Amino acid sequence: KAYGIIERFSEDIDLTIGRDAPLIFDTLPPMEDGISGKERERRTKALKAAAQSYVESIAFPELATAIERALGTKDGWEVVLDPDDRDAQTILFRYPKLLEYSVGGWGRSYGQSYGAATEGYIKPRIKLEFGARGETEPSEARTITPYLAAEFPDDLPDALVSVSTLSVERTFWEKVTILHALYHGTKLLPEMSRHYYDTMMLAAKGIDDAAKQKPDLLAKVVLNKSLMFADNKASYGTAKLGTLRLAPNDELRARLADDYDAMSEMFMAPPPSFDELMTAIAALETKLNG
């Protein structure tokens, strides 16, 4: 999104809490070399607890205060901790209704009433997923332009914001390893077909060529996931050039097709068909392993 490559709405905002953040700073790094598996597990649990405390005691109240200041009212919206997040590190901003009708091509649920009984794929809330186990490098500062600010720049001159975001090559490898893990049996969750689309779009912009020149970056992504997001089914040991698996098997493909169809309202322009997407992913797998 930060590089203008993904042409769809996002279902969430992923935020990595830096090692120098309050509460996080006091924990020992789980990725440190030379420590035992038990010590790594202990440190990971401590880091998770610190991240939970950071979200609940620092990020949550600051966000709620900032939103109230911006909206000028306490009515029609709320900020809550996501009850469905088992890690207790996600905040939901359920925003007030602005429009009385759906915005063509921008999702049938957009502008839906706050607290409405029915919701589409795009829900009337902003989901902020925090975490401290991910890595923040390599990164660079990028300017984020909201869609409305792009359409009405004179009316929203202060809407642009510079954020530190992961390099696009690292993002590519993060996506590729998700597809690899799904091929090998990692549990498929709702809304995961987006990762196939994102990977295709990154490759279409030539990011695959740039990333392939950085196999060490792929290795870093794999190491982080192996230690911080352990999954016995993911086969991270084979997630390297030559043995990457991106194209899904028939059973997984059928489930992805249904999810991709449901995802259609996230796109602002007609997306590629599911068959076109799968063809592109298969070609990318061959290219990366060649």
Predicted regions: what they are:
Residues Y3-R8, I13, G18-G290:
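Structured mid-to-C-terminal alpha-helical surface segments
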